[in-house]
């Protein structure tokens, strides 16, 4: 059987680099093969490539730490920009644009790729910024606006609840239907005025909500009307009453 040309010529193929090397092994007086200068050089090349690989591809824990630091930095920039805007009530168009740009940077490093399959979504979240005029009610006198708004989502029971605090303590509960691993269709069912007077929601009380970022501390969502919602975790143990 004919030998491959590389064996006929004494050429060796490096599996790591794909380059051909020519050379042979010399035998010592003891009968054991000893490496030639070329073989020693090849060993040095392999060591150099190994060192390069270590620095070109850092260990996984370094990459994870880098991502975590980036997320922390972007979140902090967003929260600092939101802080003086009274949940968005005093935000100018330029403020809204800047917040949206910062929010998109945070969304780009979302650590939870399928939020609706994660327990991180569950619990009571406090609204800290929104562009929704119906929630902010900025045209009303300040004493008639809700001081704090909460939203709860239970992915296990497919329920949603929005709550206001002082002065009216209004709330609304509804059902959610997953459209994919990030987005839900929302159908509101019952309003409670002053916290205890139930009113059935109209059939038109529908919408969609996409969770664009979530971790243990922060959640960003976008509605089907283009509104941005930014919430911080208030109580991870809270569950919507059935």
Swiss-Prot record:
Q: Name one GO cellular component term.
A: chloroplast thylakoid membrane
Coiled coil stretches, renumbered: 63-87
Q: Which Pfam families match?
A: PAP_fibrillin (PF04755)
Keywords, ordered alphabetically: Chloroplast, Coiled coil, Plastid, Thylakoid, Transit peptide
Protein location:
Plastid, Chloroplast thylakoid
Where is this protein's transit peptide? 1-50
| PANTHER family given in the database record | PLASTID-LIPID-ASSOCIATED PROTEIN 4, CHLOROPLASTIC-RELATED (PTHR31906)
Q: To which protein family does this belong?
A: Belongs to the PAP/fibrillin family.
Protein name (database record): Probable plastid-lipid-associated protein 4, chloroplastic
Which species expresses this protein natively? Arabidopsis thaliana (Mouse-ear cress)
